Amino acid sequence: MAIAKRKARSAPKSKGAAKAAAVKSKRRRLPYYNQTTDFSCGAASLLMAMRGLDKEIPFDRVHELQVWREANTVYMGAGHAGSSPYGIALAAWRRGFHAEIWVSHKGAVLLDYQKKPEWRKAGKLMQEADEASVRELGMPVEKRSWDVADLAQARAEGAVPIVLVSTKAFHGDNTPHWVVFADSDETRVYINDPWISRNKGQTAKFQTGRAATHAAFMNMAKYGPRNERAVVLIRGPQI
């Protein structure tokens, strides 16, 4: 054991190699924003994505609620409406960003979560209108399967993925929720989750870059009996 230690010290890495290794291993952190209501996770996630791409983006409650007001086309059946991928994409575009949407099926999402028939109809109508606007603006909407490698590639190319998940794994209930895919490595993904379950001892620091295995993340990144999946890739300010 002593010989092994002496050998390790006798051949240190160069400063350049050590610096490169440190840079490679350092996860890319995104600024964290804690949603201020129980229905503005989509808006809070978009604020984190935009702020990560442009430090001039306002990072406050007024902006959060402005974004929520624009994107709230998923009627939850109780309480206030939440954000659809199409509403998030349009809110990003209005602020100079480009978005791309991946969905597991065509048309409106999370209709199964809407309990009242009239709210289901309203949500479907508004999402269809927003989807048409997204397509007219040239933002891609793609029905596709995806995995962690696809999100990691998009992140490496400069996009920030906002992902639909269930709250069951992180918070114990089972509600549709938006989070930010901040980074990943060979075994884990790192998520900025805008919701903080303070009764579980969670803090903003705990929910910033929160780790999950690839398998756990893929299991949580779906919702409802149809296993609906949705991702909104936010890309840098439009030139």
Residue ranges and their predicted role:
Residues 1-121, 125-132, 144-145, 187-189, ...:
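Active-site-adjacent structural segments surrounding the nucleophilic cysteine of cysteine proteases
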Residues 2-4, 8-9, 155-156, 160-162, ...:
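Noncatalytic regulatory segments and standalone regulatory/sensor domains
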Residues 25-27, 32, 137, 147-149, ...:
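Residue-level detector of functional hotspots within protein domains
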Residues 88-89, 148-153, 179:
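Short amphipathic alpha-helical segments and helix-helix/interface helices
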Residues 127-169:
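Internal catalytic-core helix/loop-beta-alpha segment
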